[in-house]
């Protein structure tokens, strides 16, 4: 198993340098690779829900949450249908932790859309715990950056509605 991505293409070096300098509280990723650890080497890394349960951190700043596992720990990977089913059944603490993070901090989803099943599942778990007025607060903290194949496309900002259903 290869534990790291190949060195990024030189044409992205400026963007990667800027990314490393961002003043962010943390990273939540479903990726298994070590890109985030290399970009933010001083951040504490938590792999899956088990590490979160026993972490001593109460700060929630400077942390990387690898919610679908890490290549350095193959047993932690969420990759099969059975893994995802198990993940969804057992993610109560993770959902609670994410609720806190999502409400208290702006969240930028890079490379995901509201149509991504993983994002839908996480947001559904969170929304089910909130009153309608709190859902509005949550909405204001979520930003999605998506890649558009059309190189001539203009930048768009869209609002996504999250509704609570009984």
Report each predicted region and the residues it spans.
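Glycine-rich phosphate- or other oxyanion-binding loops that anchor nucleotides, phosphorylated ligands
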Residues: 64-66, 73-90, 94
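Active-site metal-binding loops of divalent metal-dependent hydrolases
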Residues: 32, 69, 112
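Generic structural hydrophobic/aromatic packing signal, biased to beta-strands
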Residues: 1, 64-67, 79, 142-145
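SIR2/sirtuin-family catalytic core signature
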Residues: 22, 42-45, 52-61, 72-74, ...
């Amino acid at each position: 198993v290869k534990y790291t991505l190949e060195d990024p293409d030189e044409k992205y070096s400026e963007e990667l340098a800027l990314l490393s300098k961002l003043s962010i509280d943390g990273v939540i990723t479903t990726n298994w690779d070590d890109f985030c650890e290399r970009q933010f080497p001083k951040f504490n890394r938590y792999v899956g829900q088990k590490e979160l349960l026993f972490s001593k951190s109460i700060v929630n700043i400077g942390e990387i949450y690898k919610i679908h596992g890490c290549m350095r720990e193959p047993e932690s990977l969420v990759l099969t249908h059975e893994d995802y089913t198990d993940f969804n059944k057992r993610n109560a603490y993770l959902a609670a932790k994410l609720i806190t993070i999502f409400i208290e901090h702006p969240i930028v989803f890079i490379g995901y859309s509201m149509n991504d099943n993983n994002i839908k599942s996480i947001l559904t778990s969170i929304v089910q715990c909130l009153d309608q007025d709190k859902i509005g607060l949550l909405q204001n903290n979520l930003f999605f950056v998506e890649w558009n194949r059309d190189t001539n496309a203009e930048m768009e900002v869209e609002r996504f509605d999250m509704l609570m259903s009984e």
